């Protein structure tokens, strides 16, 4: 461990400031390009001791839990609250540009579709019972310490206003001091609380049920995928199609980002008559596309497939929708199968869709919409498609995780 004064050169891919030193790059959280800072340095990791000269792009963070001096610790939920909007938005867009450029791809990248405070309808908290209280919040940066939060400016008021209720229910379910996870989803009928990492005795189950029934605004509580209590069936609206997500199901974290993605995908699909939606989840795109086209939705999670299928069967005015459970990593749709479609949409996890893209490349499908939460794997997947003759017609970065280093992207291709 050593200390020294350095000048920050740029932002790294994780939102840390990066300083050039004789020993190599040093990564320092909570610093900005152009700043002169004093750091404690351990190998390539720098810890901010003091700010000698601040950047004009530095702003006051809106949350009291953010940064080295955060209340209850340094919350790991955000990394860039101290950056101006202009710097932050450029950083997000450049993540996509740089990833594409690393694969030799130089399409025009559109302006970032921005996120706003309070947009987040899904939040994953860590909790732990202590002798004095129930800690609920986010892990401290690079630590298992829980920063217990009293506010969260990125998260919807519907969740933040019920933090006390969530703590009450969590306290009723927690039986030890072991940490556990709560994913909270704000749905149209109330909060959907998905607990993981707990074991529940019968008395605790009854206590949890009583706690839920004594509160307003809670639609469902589940534990490890099994429903504990469901006063109201959780519901999400996909432009007029109502879906009830299974416990812990993947959903887009914000409704504005989801709407922006859907708008881009629908515009690209256009007048296609048969569309395949791969990694379809609970139907974010498939059920919207079904207003104008026949859709075959493919998803690896059985409960998500059933939720999508039920929604399609119980909504009037949709074209036929078929739903298939299939692990696309192990068994991608083959090129011959894909030839039946006019357009394909794919929205894989962070690992991307490399194997599937090799089949898409051989299929000759006229239009492809690629939705991604990882610019690096997106660039790899797009390079597979462009090598097969596809032309990138649009790239739009979308901010869904405000003040973080995560960015969504919709890329459209034609052949």
Swiss-Prot record:
Ranges where the TRAM domain occurs: 1-55
Pfam families: TRAM (PF01938), tRNA_U5-meth_tr (PF05958)
Keyword ATP-binding in record: no
Gene3D superfamilies, per the entry: 2.40.50.1070, Nucleic acid-binding proteins (2.40.50.140), Vaccinia Virus protein VP39 (3.40.50.150)
Positions bound to [4Fe-4S] cluster: 63, 75, 78, 152
Superkingdom of origin organism: Bacteria
EC number: 2.1.1.-
Residues noted as binding S-adenosyl-L-methionine in the record, renumbered to the chain: 252, 279, 299, 347
Disulfide bond residue pairs: none
Catalytic center residues: 373 (nucleophile)
Stored InterPro entries: MeTrfase_TrmA_AS, NA-bd_OB-fold, SAM-dependent_MTases_sf, TRAM_dom, U5_MeTrfase_fam
MF annotations from Gene Ontology: 4 iron, 4 sulfur cluster binding; metal ion binding; rRNA (uridine-C5-)-methyltransferase activity
Keywords, in A-Z order: 4Fe-4S, Iron, Iron-sulfur, Metal-binding, Methyltransferase, S-adenosyl-L-methionine, Transferase
Keyword presence, Transmembrane helix: no
Biological process according to GO: rRNA base methylation
Enzyme class, first EC level, given as a word: transferase
Family recorded in the similarity comment: Belongs to the class I-like SAM-binding methyltransferase superfamily. RNA M5U methyltransferase family.
Protein name in the entry: Uncharacterized RNA methyltransferase R00878
